[in-house]
């Protein structure tokens, strides 16, 4: 990935997060943009979002994001000057849930493992 693409990823992610936080406070509660990947030609961007809540609530928030994709893109375009502003595709990011599950399994293993006897110091 080029340095320019990385900078565009970070810039759009930051601006989009800011727009959701300030302009759409009630609608965007529990939504976090975890990653943004812009295509090399800068025409398309995949926006990975983490949504806190039940599967039903996640689906509802994801539908809201997809329904307002054009409006959100317009708002980002007002803040960022690029030759091409990518179209946003919103994708649910399951990595926070997977991470939480891994931590839970590690905690269970920790509890089941007997403590090691401490070495005697002479």
Curated annotation (Swiss-Prot):
Organism: Opitutus terrae (strain DSM 11246 / JCM 15787 / PB90-1)
GO molecular-function terms, A-Z: ribosomal small subunit binding
Cystine pairings recorded for this chain: none
Keyword Oxidoreductase (UniProt): no
InterPro entries associated with the record: KH_dom-like_a/b, RbfA, RbfA_dom_sf
Record SUPFAM superfamilies: Ribosome-binding factor A, RbfA
Subunit text: Monomer. Binds 30S ribosomal subunits, but not 50S ribosomal subunits or 70S ribosomes.
Family: Belongs to the RbfA family.
Gene of this entry: rbfA
Subcellular localization: Cytoplasm
Role description: One of several proteins that assist in the late maturation steps of the functional core of the 30S ribosomal subunit. Associates with free 30S ribosomal subunits (but not with 30S subunits that are part of 70S ribosomes or polysomes). Required for efficient processing of 16S rRNA. May interact with the 5'-terminal helix region of 16S rRNA.
Coiled coil: none
The protein's name in its UniProt record: Ribosome-binding factor A
Database matches in NCBIfam families: rbfA
Protein keywords: Cytoplasm, Ribosome biogenesis
CC per GO annotation: cytosol
One BP annotation, GO: maturation of SSU-rRNA
